[in-house]
Amino acid sequence: MTKADLTLSYIDGRPSTVGIKAVNEVLRTVGVHASQTPSPPEARPILEASKTRALSEDEQAQLISMFSLHRSDLLAQIQLAGRTPEVHDGGHLNTSEHGVAPYPKVYDMQAMDQDAKHLVQARFGRLHVNTTDKGVGIDEVMTVVSGGPMTWFYQLPDGAVVKLSVPVVETGGPAWRLSYPGKRPHGAFLDAEHGLIVAYAHGPEKFVMRYEVPSAQGSKALATNPWIDFGGDAPRLLDE
């Protein structure tokens, strides 16, 4: 069986872009960069446990520590994507959405029942931007450390919304890491049976997740997603 690779799909029928190098060439136009990072051996027991149960708060804290990103690491991720930090020197490293736990945090698929998954899919699946009231965005780094597959969406300069398919991460295998700007339209669809994402976001102290920003680049695409059918009982990811 051939191992799945990072794949970028186009809704207009263009051939998919496959492989990390080719995908990054396309996504760099909107400040997005994908990479792989080794999984530390000491993480293996937690990653294995996450296949069958939700992690405890202590295990989540351990996981964040094992996949920690310091200020210099976060700035390096921005540079790899061809961006400059939204806030000088990276800003606050524990930014938060109003009323929501601050970053860094762990998204654990086993911690969600079906109803919770559907709510998350509806919330994150619609294209959105993460900004302050003054329009300052956050810088985001998502690392899929186990499970999957996972899906992200980005809007290209020509207005096309592309689907980025991130393959399954096997226990002990390299993690997939995505760096992208929160101020550009993006989304995610999390439907894996199990999987862990170590999530970092930084910049302004607080931000708001927005589905309507008339002045934002690509604002017409916000609150929609051509790759997801929101009309049924639960959001459904569409094929090409």
Listing of model-derived features with the role each one plays in the protein:
Residues L27, V32-E170, L190-E240:
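Active-site region of the double-stranded beta-helix
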